[in-house]
Amino acid sequence: MKPSERICAALDFPTFAAAEPFARAVAPEVGILKVGLELFAAEGPAAVRAAARLGRPVFLDLKLHDIPNTVEGAARSAAASGAALLTVHAAGGAEMVRAAVRGAGPGVRVLAVTVLTSLDAAALEAIGLAGPPEAAVVRLARLAVDAGAGGIVCSPHEVAAVRAAVGPGPLLVVPGVRPAGAAKGDQARVATPAEAVRAGADVIVVGRPLRDAPDPAAAARAIAGEL
């Protein structure tokens, strides 16, 4: 995998019209474009189709978490929109993950989100998950992969442990990545792009450091250079 192919650019904008100049600038420099909740809530499948026209696989980051039948139908609809990757919450349980995989079909890789990168140990304890985040992440990752998930979303702090737990097959997608010197924002567990890849990440998700850069394409090239 070329360094640029490891970069997933997050289209964190309220509309595709707002996202399009950024998306067109970075598409030649990255491997994947990500449509998240804000953009999908505004424009639905049209946002996925518009992003896909830029010639890159689209990662639809909806973090589905519902009863299995509902998630299966949502995954089927996501596949019809043209998404290449789709997220669900591993905490929804093994049957929900299996339902997502059934609904998505063979053309879409279902990625299971373990623990959000905005949560630290204190936040996890407050919702009943005592102990270090790594233990919860590894447990959820194993559950999801055993249920058929094609990949795992986890923070750079846990990616090495997840790789050791699930083996070489699943795609490991890592948000919470910030180039050296960049602000952490609302992320609690972060690392640089190079640190994440050295730890075992296949794909790094980059949002604000690209979106807020004066020249997003140059910023993407700089990140690829770090890898």
From Swiss-Prot:
Pathway: Pyrimidine metabolism; UMP biosynthesis via de novo pathway; UMP from orotate: step 2/2. The lineage of its organism: Bacteria, Pseudomonadati, Myxococcota, Myxococcia, Myxococcales. GO terms for molecular function: orotidine-5'-phosphate decarboxylase activity. The gene is pyrF. Pfam families: OMPdecase (PF00215). Catalyzes the decarboxylation of orotidine 5'-monophosphate (OMP) to uridine 5'-monophosphate (UMP). It comes from Anaeromyxobacter dehalogenans (strain 2CP-C). It catalyses: orotidine 5'-phosphate + H(+) = UMP + CO2. Homodimer. NCBIfam families: PRK00230.1 (NF001273), pyrF (TIGR01740). This is Orotidine 5'-phosphate decarboxylase. It comes from the Bacteria. Belongs to the OMP decarboxylase family. Type 1 subfamily. Keywords: Decarboxylase, Lyase, Pyrimidine biosynthesis. It is an enzyme of class 4 (lyase). Transmembrane segments: none annotated. The keyword Lyase applies.
